[in-house]
Amino acid sequence: MSYANYRYMKARAKRWRPENLDGIQTSDEHLINLFAKILSKHVPEIGKFDPNKDVESYISKLDQHFTEYPSLFPNEHTKRQYTLNHLEELEQQFAERMFSENGSLTWQELLRQTGKVQGSNKGDRLTKTFEGFRNQLDKVQFIRKLMSKANVDDFHTRLFILWMLPYSLRKLKERNYWKSEISEIYDFLEDKRTASYGKTHKRFQPQNKNLGKESLSKKNNTTNSRNLRKTNVSRIEYSSNKFLNHTRKRYEMVLQAELPDFKCSIPCLIDTGAQANIITEETVRAHKLPTRPWSKSVIYGGVYPNKINRKTIKLNISLNGISIKTEFLVVKKFSHPAAISFTTLYDNNIEISSSKHTLSQMNKVSNIVKEPELPDIYKEFKDITAETNTEKLPKPIKGLEFEVELTQENYRLPIRNYPLPPGKMQAMNDEINQGLKSGIIRESKAINACPVMFVPKKEGTLRMVVDYKPLNKYVKPNIYPLPLIEQLLAKIQGSTIFTKLDLKSAYHLIRVRKGDEHKLAFRCPRGVFEYLVMPYGISTAPAHFQYFINTILGEAKESHVVCYMDDILIHSKSESEHVKHVKDVLQKLKNANLIINQAKCEFHQSQVKFIGYHISEKGFTPCQENIDKVLQWKQPKNRKELRQFLGSVNYLRKFIPKTSQLTHPLNNLLKKDVRWKWTPTQTQAIENIKQCLVSPPVLRHFDFSKKILLETDASDVAVGAVLSQKHDDDKYYPVGYYSAKMSKAQLNYSVSDKEMLAIIKSLKHWRHYLESTIEPFKILTDHRNLIGRITNESEPENKRLARWQLFLQDFNFEINYRPGSANHIADALSRIVDETEPIPKDSEDNSINFVNQISITDDFKNQVVTEYTNDTKLLNLLNNEDKRVEENIQLKDGLLINSKDQILLPNDTQLTRTIIKKYHEEGKLIHPGIELLTNIILRRFTWKGIRKQIQEYVQNCHTCQINKSRNHKPYGPLQPIPPSERPWESLSMDFITALPESSGYNALFVVVDRFSKMAILVPCTKSITAEQTARMFDQRVIAYFGNPKEIIADNDHIFTSQTWKDFAHKYNFVMKFSLPYRPQTDGQTERTNQTVEKLLRCVCSTHPNTWVDHISLVQQSYNNAIHSATQMTPFEIVHRYSPALSPLELPSFSDKTDENSQETIQVFQTVKEHLNTNNIKMKKYFDMKIQEIEEFQPGDLVMVKRTKTGFLHKSNKLAPSFAGPFYVLQKSGPNNYELDLPDSIKHMFSSTFHVSHLEKYRHNSELNYATIDESDIGTILHILEHKNREQVLYLNVKYISNLNPSTIMSGWTTLATALQADKAIVNDYIKNNNLNI
């Protein structure tokens, strides 16, 4: 072998893997003998199983073999498979059938059972034939055995396979076997190599020149493929194409490919003759699979080749339960929706079972991959590479030790240990042993220590880390700044060659200041240890490391180095200059005893991956893995997942125009007062973001020598800008995009202020570029009036404008006007994207008009001009140019437009009402409120009295009235019930329910005397009847205090039953009922219930099931407490003395206990005065929180609140907020009204409502007509009135709602809609009113 040949094979062997022999299919005896000869030198032979011999001795032999080669047989499955392969054909069939019936059989039991059945069978058996050898040891196991031997070098094994096998086979008589059977070696020698290599190694070609037609076809095809490659265009070859792949045995089958990320499955052709994965455009569109452009043109097809210029991102795919991640080229047409190539199966160790039509995945072979070598030019620095250095305790560098400053010394951290499973114990022990061995940790006696936790590595193993969160609370912050990414990238401008260095275990290269080690102690089941080097997880570590590396690099970081933490990028403008720069940096690292991770370093590259970006001479783009992370994101299920998604998007925001606008619907879900509800709006927002990342722009490096252009614009909720620079081709290329959401205060700015805000924010964002420019840069805006405001030297209008003008003095710029139609990019940054339609493919940068609700058609213009003739002032402006110039009004296409780009319209016309209706009811904003609707319309139109007309329209909108809640104070002042003249004349009653069961009771009957405030508490059950309640009231109240005159209670079925009515009639008292859901009516009982519940909690909170035992104590405690309303105790008012409450006091008796005595009368009078005073005070306090009552008159239409009253209330959260409207019949009290409820619900609800539960229904037939959705009209009850509007008859109908069948509604609808709902009633109305239809 020549030296040149050896070097080429050496380079090839570095990239080759043993799995590449998976494609071998052979039946040649010579080849098998060759394999057997090679194998015999490395792996001992294990003969076939003979059931006629001792089974146990063969089991022992196999067991010893498994023990000797553990890497080949890691589990029971591999041992069982090896055992099956060593059975003869008959025994193998029997064993497979036995294993399918009992999958838990071990390989030992498999042999014993087989020996029992087959041991008596006589006859000739197969010996070591070719098929026997293949069953004994397949090609993959052959390679694994070679690789498993310690004395076989990884590299030389690959070299042996690639070189010796073809070379030996060449000597065989059978010349074509190695070409047709060993496909991977053939591909390497014939198809993969360069043309120059083919000329040099002619001895690898078959010696017989008289090949058959088939061989000649193969040779020609290979040549065609090689010639095609010279044109830099790849070719995908399929069986239906002109160019076929004859180098391997081809097999096809169709499987369902599951795409879990997109919740779909597609039929997929598994084709071993294909060299690339493909998918059709139709499939991509149907399942909305994300794609991206592909710069490498690919030809596929036969006689008429086609080009491919797009491919999908890497997709997660499941085939027969095997998960793989791969990408597809997108083609226009193919025989199947998608196809998986042999290469993909190959790379994922997937084999095809042609008999079972299934796929199976083999275990991957672990290979030792050598780290990239240090270039020869830097060999002098080999001693600072990780290859020559093991981790050890670094020497301290004076002034750069890691200091742990604490806010307080006397602190205690929580101590809690967690049991660890065996897997984590092993990972912990490995980390501890390694740390102790290298000296970076030591045992500690610290009294405070943080716990450890485990995080998964990329390869699936666990890494032990210390959770320093408890300690970080006491650590003083380090204010040393981390570099801004944008400023780092700006320093790279002009560089053409790059080298990236990565420090090995970067944090562990810094020593901890002596005396601070105990502060970094950590605890684990093995004990307490402390770090001698800077650990990960401490809050001040990132800032200190940045200070450390900046100090080490010194002045170099100002000229040819940028570094972010342990990532160091060296950049230069020429090759010779770059060598000096790299040596300078390596020397500085060497002087500081720092070690580089050679495997992650890249030397002398034209483009590199650095801090998440691909950086080159032209500019920088985001890394594909960061883009794929966003593209593959599923729909967030909660706020946490949404924040994670927005975090990934925010990292890429400089590449996404209109970021703030695109994320606006998503950010709204993160507000505290917004309930989580995912809608199609949010889904479309995510899709729009993903579309922007399918083909992200290349941002150029900022160059201070080039001309600068800043384009700005503002929309309703955000500002946007794009910074560009002019290059040698006289074109402007973007340096960066910027967008920002406005604050609540900024949303109220005028249009001019918002446009100026866009300029101010953009200048602040790019201040490091724009503040120090020598030549003035250009600012382009689409707001003409803004130029005058900035260049005007007159006194500013307000303090905000004065601050802005002062800020602008720091910049050297000139501002120019460009119409919005030409300001595509900046306008798009700030405008609202239509969230109901996908973004057109060819309009990524087109501006989107945010007030596109009304098209300015010729018909609209003609209608406006016609309206002008009816308005004297506008007609004067239309005909007088001087007047227009004086008032700064322009005439465009016959329309009058003011300085704010608003179209002037006559006031209060049919045209203005149409505009209001379109924006309010037909626009993309759902029934906006008065302020929002006004702001939207004012963007494009204006007329005199516009605000008043919009207010009147919105207030009379039927949909808004019944669905939107009111935020005003409640109606109606408090109307206290006057006190009675004496105790136990006026009572109130209620039940306390939901109590735990105690002695068979689970409720409490509460009776309160409204005069003395005395309470009677009687345990009962929730299921108590009216008869039982009456008996209880008779025995516990009337028997002691006599008959009351009146009782106030709620509308409980007990008190409204006939039994209770008879009971009231018997004892001659009147029942008064509080209003439903109006607790203020019977506030006394509500307050008493709260007090009783508090007392019960105090005495039995620890044993709640004993509350019945404490009722007498609670009642005594309540009745002997001084009441705030009477200034006396209830007991004293009723009984005229105070009982002894403890053994240390005596009861106090009055001299006169007669009820009619003068003293008693005086006490009652005092109590009554106190009650009246309390009522006045209570009314004053309550009335401070209400607004003036709105008086309703009989015949007025009102709506009833659903949510608070329970009236017609359903659990459906999308039900209207109000029911109605209903007619007012009469006023039934100071604040109560009786309504005309439909007969269908009168029996269900009280027809009397407090004014606080009512809202006036505003109805203006001039404004609102056809207010009903025709699908909501069920049965029409009757027709109230009619109107003719624009030659259309509208009917005001009262009807039963289809959406809420228990609701009676009314509203305007067209005659046609009414006829569809109920033809008979409509015809009767037309006939009775003599309407001419």
Swiss-Prot record:
Residues that coordinate or bind Mg(2+) 2: 990, 1050
UniProt PTM: Processing of the polyproteins proceeds by an ordered pathway, called maturation. It involves the initial cleavage of a 27 kDa capsid protein (CA) from the N-terminus of the polyprotein, followed by the cleavage of a 56 kDa integrase (IN) from the C-terminus. This leaves a 72 kDa protease-reverse transcriptase fusion protein (PR-RT), which does not seem to be processed further.
Positions annotated as active site in the UniProt record: 271 (for protease activity)
Segments of skewed composition (Polar residues): 218-231
Domain Integrase catalytic: 979-1138
GO biological process terms held by the UniProt record: DNA integration; DNA recombination; proteolysis
Molecular function via GO: aspartic-type endopeptidase activity; DNA binding; DNA-directed DNA polymerase activity; endonuclease activity; metal ion binding; RNA binding; RNA-directed DNA polymerase activity
GO cellular component: nucleus
Keyword terms of this UniProt record: Aspartyl protease, DNA integration, DNA recombination, DNA-binding, DNA-directed DNA polymerase, Endonuclease, Hydrolase, Magnesium, Metal-binding, Multifunctional enzyme, Nuclease, Nucleotidyltransferase, Protease, RNA-binding, RNA-directed DNA polymerase, Transferase, Transposable element
Every Peptidase A2 domain range: 266-342
Annotated binding of Mg(2+) 1, by residue: 502, 566-567
Domain Reverse transcriptase: 436-615
Annotated stretches, region: Disordered: 199-231
Extra facts: Retrotransposons are mobile genetic entities that are able to replicate via an RNA intermediate and a reverse transcription step. In contrast to retroviruses, retrotransposons are non-infectious, lack an envelope and remain intracellular. Tf2 retrotransposons belong to the gypsy-like elements (metaviridae).
PANTHER family xref list: PROTEIN CBG26694, PROTEIN NYNRIN-LIKE
Protein name per UniProt: Transposon Tf2-3 polyprotein
Source lineage: Eukaryota, Fungi, Dikarya, Ascomycota, Taphrinomycotina
